[in-house]
Swiss-Prot record:
It comes from Protopterus annectens. The keyword Cell inner membrane does not apply. Its main location: secreted. One of its GO terms (molecular function) is growth hormone receptor binding. This is Somatolactin. Glycans are attached at residue 147. One of its GO terms (biological process) is positive regulation of receptor signaling pathway via JAK-STAT. Keywords: Disulfide bond, Glycoprotein, Hormone, Secreted, Signal. Pituitary gland.
Length: 232
């Protein structure tokens, strides 16, 4: 049962200012000093901070692709189910008002791109906690898949904290507000996907798509901020 449905996105459907209040004191894990304490990253250049965030997003996307492949290979004839599920417009984050393509992302501000990455990262933290629990119920699941999903679950908060620092560094604002408001959406599994393994695969596949968006948005931000060239 997906007991978490309709719950884990609730916090996302607040103003971005409210989201910011909840993470105001967060710092990126990569900013630990030798003693293990956190710094404010004030000595780290914007370019390096963007590079770190991009590297996180690239790895998340790569690991998500590998996880999808492992899942498909170990659930024959699951490849047929997975191929069908790829075509379903049933991802849990489909209700978020975010750029849906690179061309759309090119039309929005830096603030909105940062907002979009942060919301995407936050939206997947709880589903991966759920996924860790449900994967534990499988009898013959490859250890590599368990390790990869755990790695993603551990890295998402790190990327979240890094985006918070980028927001401070790039926008020079202690509080960010936008007109982003949405009502709570009741998240339901697609009626076409009734098998629990297919639903779990859908989570992995949807995250793969969103991880690619995170990577794309961050690379566009770096192009705008660092290269100052034509980013189209």
């Amino acid at each position: 049962m997906h007991n978490w449905k309709g719950v884990w996105l609730c916090s996302l459907f607040l103003t971005f200012g409210q989201l910011w209040n909840g993470i105001l004191l967060a710092y990126p894990l990569d900013c630990k000093d030798e003693q293990g304490s956190y710094t404010r990253c004030t000595s780290i250049s914007l370019e390096k901070l963007l590079d770190r965030a991009i590297q996180h997003a690239e790895l998340l996307y790569r690991v998500s692709e590998e996880s999808c492949t492992i899942f498909e290979d170990n659930f024959a004839p699951f490849s047929l189910v997975s191929q069908r599920s790829r075509n379903f417009n049933s991802c849990y984050t489909k209700g978020l008002r975010l750029p849906s393509s690179k061309s759309e992302a090119q039309q929005v501000s830096d603030k909105w791109l940062l907002h979009s990455v942060l919301v995407l990262v936050q939206s997947w933290i709880e589903p991966f906690v759920y996924l860790q629990r449900t994967l534990d119920t499988y009898n013959s699941l490859p250890g590599s898949l368990v390790n990869k999903t755990k790695w993603v679950s551990d890295k998402l908060p790190s990327l979240e904290q890094g985006i918070v620092v980028l927001i401070r560094k790039m926008l020079h604002e202690g509080l960010i507000t936008t007109d982003f408001q949405q009502s709570v959406i009741e998240i339901e599994p697609s009626p076409e996907i009734t098998d629990s393994s297919a639903r779990d695969y859908m989570i992995l596949n949807c995250f793969r798509k969103d991880a690619h968006k995170m990577e794309t948005f961050l690379k566009l931000l770096k192009c705008r901020q660092i290269k100052k060239l034509n980013c189209y």
